[in-house]
Design a protein with these regions (language model features):
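Residue-identity detector for glycine
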Residues: 2, 20-25
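Non-catalytic helical/linker scaffolds that mediate oligomerization, partner binding
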Residues: 26-176
Length: 176
């Protein structure tokens, strides 16, 4: 799978370069956000043009089959990426029960101290925790949040979410 991701990233970057989309003088630049289930995958993503990577730390990660990073690996990943101008987004995109909130708060606190660039979140309770514990770190709504309407996007923005990954079920025709 890692080879396929690298191949797709190379094709994508070639297309961007051919179109002359350097980000200079344009209203918006496409961000290449790549999954990183290991340090090896993270390095491959960065070396092949990813602007940002997303990864899991601890237990609040919906990427089934992906290994979560330890605290030491998370710190190593953040340093590796930041030295190269690449952002690290932490996935906290599972539903979190009341009894898990204290652990989620600890994960948010640790990740913020280590310097993650954004949280990718599903649970509204976790959105509130992120705002309370790490208000300087942007919050992105995960596709698992199932936002599929303009009203949903507006509500997420009111809750402090700066980016929304729309629901997978949303037809292309409805995305404007």
């Amino acid at each position: 799978i890692g080879i396929l991701v690298v191949y797709c990233m190379r094709i994508f970057m070639r297309c961007v370069r051919q179109r002359g989309n350097t980000g200079e003088g344009t209203a918006a630049m496409i961000e290449l956000l790549s999954p990183a289930g290991s340090m090896e995958a993270l390095r491959a993503a960065v070396q092949n043009g990813a602007n940002a990577v997303y990864l899991g730390y601890d237990a609040f990660n919906a990427r089934m089959g992906a290994r979560n990073f330890s605290v030491d690996e998370l710190q190593e990943a953040i340093v590796y990426c930041h030295v190269r101008g690449v952002q690290v987004h932490l996935t906290l995109n599972t539903l979190v029960s009341d009894r898990e909130m204290a652990r989620a708060a600890e994960v948010i606190r640790t990740a913020a101290v280590l310097g993650v660039d954004a949280f990718i979140v599903q649970d509204l309770g976790v959105v509130a925790l992120c705002r309370e514990i790490a208000p300087e770190v942007p919050i992105h709504a995960s596709t698992q949040m199932s936002i599929h309407s303009l009203e949903g996007v507006q509500q997420a923005a009111e809750l402090g979410v700066s980016r929304v990954v729309l629901a997978r079920e949303l037809p292309r025709e409805e995305i404007a």
